[in-house]
């Protein structure tokens, strides 16, 4: 006899009671596995089994899920049951647990919820595979599993859910082919989102049978082959088709151009080619967005584009389009974005610029990028009549001549203006002063002349002003001091004269660079330069500057590059330059400097390049610090120098004669004895005072992290033996140790003599006390005590990371081939993904938002499985409502992070933000791909890591890629018939572009962590399955 639902419920409850509360979830799982009984009780058991399969149950989200009686599961969080008046009350019809912080696998038991219509588990941390049992949900209409870490393939059995209208499996780690069953059986599907996975193979032609489809997104996968022509048979109500960032090839089928309902169409970043049919846009009247960038399309822009009258974005950059730009844009009254850069467009005659007059009818135009083409001739005055909404205008890297339109100041909405690398002549129009919203003005490498207009001082929002390599003359305008948001100023290689205006150094925001080199500037360097405490680069070489080097340069604490060579400077080198602890390059050559070389320069540990040649220095050359390496210093042309290391080949210095007979030994000896007695008394008094406090308990503790004693740490580290020293920094030293509670640990002993070390200790404890993530270094315990001398002692004990830091792997110190470490490309991408996940957790998913403030390769530690863990939270900031919890003034807060990695806005005292971490992460991405530190000595002041990569992307990518990744870069890049090699190239290019996108100057322009993770997952999946050796190239991955 069949059992009733009530008896099933009672039996299940008795089973749970007999087993006991502690194993209730396991009991539910077992019961669900042993029975296929349906009904209300079956629904409850299926839900409890699902709960038991989770590793993390979302805190309070599933707290209500327990065996509480018939039908009570309908009150559980996320559970929706059918109405009581209906035929089947208490049956689960919806399970909605989006963003519930769940982790674990999706239990097959959910396949028993036979009345389920909607299942939404998106934006959690679920893993494992999609259970085929879900195909039993014959009533299912909505299945959303996006934003998890689900692996495996899409089960073909999903085709049995024939009532599905929405299927979203995006942002996971799915692999394999797209089942043809989706197209063959899911006739009611209106939404299909499979993007941002690792799906491969061809797009099934059966997808063309989805006659109800409205939203279709397969982007960011590894799909290959041609676009099926059957997709042109899709629903007449299809709104979006997104196929970007795959490996699709061939031409766009003509049938696609007949999808008259289409609103958005994207195929960018593929290998598609061919010409666009002349009538392609004839029926696409509703099209709003078309993105075909970074492909191999050629020919002309079809005139039929004018028929797409609703078009807002047209992006065809990075192709081989050529000829004259069409003049049909004037009918696109809703156009906001036009990307034509990096093509082969040309303008031979003045009438070829007619499309600009056409664009003046586009009153909503915001972005116009014509850079990197073959545009020539003179700009028409109609440029000044473009929309006042235009915020981005790029004409760089063309062959444009003539003058800049005098009324360009009419474009009052401009925020970015790129005119560099052309042949512009004449003067800068004074109307530029009307562009009050302008943030970036780049016009270097032209033939501009005349004086720099005073009206430039009206651009108070300007961040970047680069006018170098032109023919400007006259004085540097004093009105530049009005640019109170300026970060970088480049005026090099012009004919400027007069003094450097002292007002320039009152711009407190100037932090990236001042470059006034290679001009005819005169006078002295203003003392006010010391106001720029955050300045990184100062170039004033090759001028006619005279007078002394100002002592105040020593106040520019963040200065890394100082170039003053080829001037008329006199006097001695101020010893204050020794305060510039981050200085890497100092060039004072070819001046009239004299006196001794100050020994303080030897204390600058970062100084790798020092040029003092062709001056009149005298006396002994130091032998330590920068002076210990002859390859990094140049001192020729100073005839009166002596001493130094042997490699300098200088004469020995004559020792001074000592007159010991008249040396006042006795008075000095008595004074020393007295001083020592006083100091000893003070020491005993201080020690006694500290020991009286020893019994008082320390207030420094962390919930869940019991304190450990000083004596335990002494024992664990063999008395902090030098053999156990792992590394040392400004705030502390790290030792390897062994505690009873852990096999091996890392013990960070704070250097409390540094006043900032205690703040570092507090910040790290505060930031990590409630943090739990697989990619964060775990704190084992802490110690806040007194050492055996009565001094305060503080230490943090972490999990030991046996594989060392990422810095050790990217920049190994040893040159012994037998001891070289190698990270292949796939491993590097995995490490970057680990770090991105850690930052995503800190910024968005932790108990409270935390900004790390010091993301760099030495703070990324690797465990025995090479999983990356972000550590060293000594500079971290907890945010409350997006604002740093620890509010300090600019002067007291100082500079955050490490030179080279720190965001430029930190240099001007901005509050810590997640955008700053993203900038540092971007630099880390570039470092891990290029193998170069951001402070590499090969970089010039005008060519940092970002510029170095940008040049590589515009030229030969192999020139900037770490040589450890390429054994034969020439064959690799030119191996056009080798698909795996092309894919590796694409992955590296994508990584470099990601690094540049994350490290943009403007904080709000940087890529958010969620998008970073999506991009890295796509890159990682694109690398999977490649052969380890490519024909014509040997690569690691």
UniProtKB/Swiss-Prot annotation:
Disulfide bonds: none annotated. Residues 720-1019 form the Protein kinase domain. The chain crosses the membrane at residues 666-686. Its EC number is 2.7.11.1. It comes from the Eukaryota. The modification Phosphoserine is found at residues 698, 701. Glycans are attached at residues 66, 101, 112, 209, 247, 258, 307, 334, 361, 385, 447, 458, 482, 495, 515, 592, 611. Residues 687-1037 are cytoplasmic. Belongs to the protein kinase superfamily. Ser/Thr protein kinase family. ATP binds at residues 726-734, 748. The modification Phosphothreonine is found at residues 700, 717. The keyword Coiled coil does not apply. This is Receptor kinase-like protein Xa21. Enzymatic activity is fifteen time stronger with Mn(2+) than with Mg(2+). One of its GO terms (cellular component) is endoplasmic reticulum membrane. SUPFAM superfamilies: L domain-like, Protein kinase-like (PK-like), RNI-like.
